[in-house]
Amino acid sequence: MGIRNYRPYTPGTRQKSVSDFSEITHDQPEKSLTSFRHRAKGRNNRGVITSRRRGGGHKRLYREIDFRRNKLSVPGTVLTVEYDPNRNARISLVQYEDGEKRYILHPRNLAVGAVIAAGPDAAIEVGNALPLSKIPLGTGVHNVEITPGRGGQMVRAAGAMAQVVAKEGDMVTLKLPSGEVRLFRKECYATIGQIGNVDVNNISIGKAGRNRWKGRRPKVRGSVMNPVDHPHGGGEGRAPIGRSGPVTPWGKPTLGYKTRKKKKLSNALIVRRRRKSSKRGRGGRQS
């Protein structure tokens, strides 16, 4: 993947950059693997906003992705590499020997025409899915299962890759992209390789309208709201927040306040927590 930059013809193109889509080989999805789904727009079943700043955006067709990779010992051929509007990774259409077609997340350096497989006896090659117990130490993997048979739930974003670092008994240790070191059961499946579209984080949005196309609405600072809308709101002019520290719209401490439950069951599986990320950026005290 490459990144295409624009000349400053307009204020919107001055900082704008986009993917050059050079890896895309087909522009129409497989019709049998697409479906229309109404978007939640950040609302729950009662219509109450549960996730702010979502709504609008271009219409999308959902592509059914095979996260389980449960087509065992049946080779498949990669037919296309396609764009998916529902995620930042690319997807590949795979046709298996029995004629069935499925979409998978497109790994980096997986070419059209390559043959992939899933199962405990599959080769250690990009695109193949195996149990963690069969994957050598140091191998990069993605689409990792948390519960055996449930399908991959971790390491699915563009450019993401986890690394197998240790095996002991019934557990395998992976180092995740966040820096967290975690234990997984050896029966959990993972796919060899790194997710493609690795330069996606280097793309500059350039203008507010592109975020609206994606269904992302503006993020308003609490300090410019009224007191009825946010604890930071109100005052004359640019007033301080009037508290000892920043809080959420519901009055809970934020920006560094730990929210993870102390008795969370997965704590026993985490060897080392992920590295800290700084949330105090420009205007970070205003939530």
From Swiss-Prot:
The keyword Ribonucleoprotein applies. It comes from the Bacteria. One of its GO terms (molecular function) is transferase activity. Residues 12-22 have a biased composition (Polar residues). Residues 1-30, 211-287 are annotated as: Disordered. GO terms for cellular component: large ribosomal subunit. NCBIfam families: rplB_bact (TIGR01171). This is Large ribosomal subunit protein uL2. The gene is rplB.
